């Protein structure tokens, strides 16, 4: 057994997040577990082979699909600390032992409302927006570009979340395509040519993703003009 604390704070802060992972990846083995179970397996074999997107989904989890989702309603909506929450500043995944170049996946801001961007091992530079992120907020910063879209989505979650999900799905599909292209071409490149190619591929995807989120933010702002309380419905007969 692995020993640790087992107090009330763990039942709210730690154990529910482990439970969420077991429900996602090993539900057939975790049928008797509850969010506050104190005896949880330290190692558990998943029911299926996990992909990089499974890892991303876990780190973005906020108990969606359960009564414990903070985005829901009811007495249980804020009972447990989720994995992804508004205080998340950035999230990282290291994808190792790849046949070509390893990948550092980086999500800026709230990962549940962001996109994991792949940066290849061996790059020599990153886009300028990824080098900025100080206060006050500035929209030439990758962090604030993602955060801007996130807070806009939060303002009218029911209407805007599907638009965000569409962008996330498109960007994930583009990542798969870009990585496959990189893996296909990389074996023929060496030295400086390899580094230049990896940098160009990473930069291109990162920049396209920032542009996608900028476009989303403008779309959301445009739609939000219809939600303004300072409005008046003119009689159609006038």
Could you say what each language-model-derived stretch is?
Residues 1-238:
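C-terminus-biased signal that marks the final domain/tail of proteins
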């Amino acid at each position: 057994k692995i020993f640790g604390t087992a107090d009330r704070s763990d039942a709210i802060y730690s154990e529910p997040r482990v439970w969420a992972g077991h429900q996602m990846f090993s539900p057939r083995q975790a049928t008797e577990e509850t969010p506050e179970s104190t005896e949880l397996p330290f190692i558990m074999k998943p029911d299926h082979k996990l992909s990089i997107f499974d890892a991303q989904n876990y780190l973005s989890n906020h108990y969606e699909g359960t009564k414990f989702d903070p985005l829901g309603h009811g007495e249980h909506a804020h009972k447990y600390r989720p994995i992804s929450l508004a205080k998340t500043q950035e999230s990282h995944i290291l994808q190792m032992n790849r046949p070509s170049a390893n990948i550092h996946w980086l999500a800026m801001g709230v990962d549940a409302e962001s996109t994991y961007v792949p940066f290849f091992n061996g790059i020599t530079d990153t886009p300028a927006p990824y080098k900025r992120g100080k206060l006050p907020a500035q929209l030439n910063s990758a962090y604030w570009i993602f955060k801007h879209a996130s807070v806009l989505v939060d303002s009218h979650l029911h209407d805007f979340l599907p638009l965000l999900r569409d962008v996330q799905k498109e960007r994930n599909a583009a990542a798969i395509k870009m990585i496959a292209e990189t893996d296909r071409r990389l074996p023929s490149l060496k030295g400086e040519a390899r580094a230049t190619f990896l940098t160009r591929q990473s930069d291109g995807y990162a920049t396209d993703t920032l542009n996608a989120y900028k476009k989303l933010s403008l779309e959301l702002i445009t739609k939000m003009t219809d939600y303004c309380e300072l409005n008046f419905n003119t009689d159609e007969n006038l």
